[in-house]
Design a protein with these regions (language model features):
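Iron-sulfur (Fe-S) cluster-binding modules
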Residues: 1-156, 225, 234, 253-268
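Local cysteine-cluster metal-coordination motifs and their immediate loop/turn environment
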Residues: 3-4, 101-112, 170-183, 207-221, ...
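Short, Lys/Arg-enriched charge-dense amphipathic segments
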Residues: 123-129, 181-195, 249-259
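Conserved adenosyl
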Residues: 132-137, 145-157, 161, 175-183, ...
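Ferredoxin-like iron-sulfur electron-transfer modules
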Residues: 161-168, 172, 189-218, 222-242, ...
Length: 268
């Protein structure tokens, strides 16, 4: 079980605890004001932060310290954890308010303002989010509508994650590819850790795998490898984020998710 489940979930999956989406929690510690500032200054905040990290993290003396401090700051304010589709559907079932809106990361990294891959959840934040750019394209969804969209994202290979706004309040679901800022900061450049791996890790059943390699093309983390000798794929557990989207393209159902905690010394 991850540290967040211990701290915010009483030893259970923290993102399935209703109180982490509650109005009572939302009203504490200046979260409404934090969200106002987050939306209004997203581009400014992240452009400056990434530039500063890029400058400092690779310095031999202070780099490690800066990276640790950045991770500590993210854990307190705004971080994400990967969630497979079956857990994501349970999260959706907890919600009374779900809104689909354009991805601020893709807007910043690709210039596409209409890429509606993100979901606001938790307390109804209509008034707060009305201040965001492109608020006119926001779409309120019923639970089953949201699940249908999320399943389609799963088949497209988009990895799902939940995000905090002043931890442990969870206010968003993201569905990411390599245009995501978190991916670029963490996976591509290894500047700092802003998203944590799922509660699971993927495993391949070689009795079922036919070596088609569809899953290999679906993995965004380079965790799946093909053996030309064995004509099968394997998942490198140390690199696996446990997102589970590789399963969506496996016609043989050869890939399953197992609890990460069952494997010694795997990274979170």
């Amino acid at each position: 079980m991850c540290e967040f489940c211990i701290q915010h979930g009483e030893g259970k999956k923290w993102y399935l605890e209703m109180r982490n989406y509650s109005r009572e929690l939302w009203a504490q510690e200046g979260r409404p004001e934090f969200m106002d500032d987050y939306g209004a200054r997203f581009e400014e905040r992240y452009t400056k932060r990434v530039a500063l990290l890029d400058m400092l993290v690779n310095k031999p003396v202070v780099g490690g310290f800066i990276r640790r401090m950045a991770i500590r700051s993210q854990k307190a304010e705004h971080w994400g954890q990967m969630v497979p589709i079956e857990d994501l559907e349970q999260i959706v079932d907890l919600q009374t308010w779900i809104v689909r809106f354009p991805c601020v990361c893709r807007n910043l990294t690709t210039g596409h303002r209409e890429a509606r891959y993100c979901f606001g959840i938790g307390v109804d934040m209509t008034d707060t989010m009305a201040k965001y750019p492109d608020a006119g394209s926001f779409e309120v969804l019923e639970r089953e509508e949201a699940k249908k969209v999320l399943r389609s994202f799963d088949k497209q290979g988009l990895v799902h994650s939940v995000w905090t706004f002043k931890t442990p309040y969870i206010g968003a679901i993201c569905n990411c590819d390599q245009d995501c800022l978190a991916y670029r900061i963490q996976v591509k450049t290894n500047l700092t850790q802003v998203m944590f791996r799922a509660e699971y890790v993927g495993l391949v059943d070689w009795d079922l795998c036919n070596g088609c390699r569809k899953c290999l093309l679906h993995c965004q983390f380079g965790a799946i490898h093909y053996s030309n000798t064995m004509k099968r794929v394997t998942i490198e557990t140390a690199r696996c984020y446990g997102c589970g989207v590789c399963r969506a393209v496996c016609d043989k159902e050869a890939i399953s998710l197992k609890p990460r905690a069952d494997f010694a010394r795997l990274p979170w």
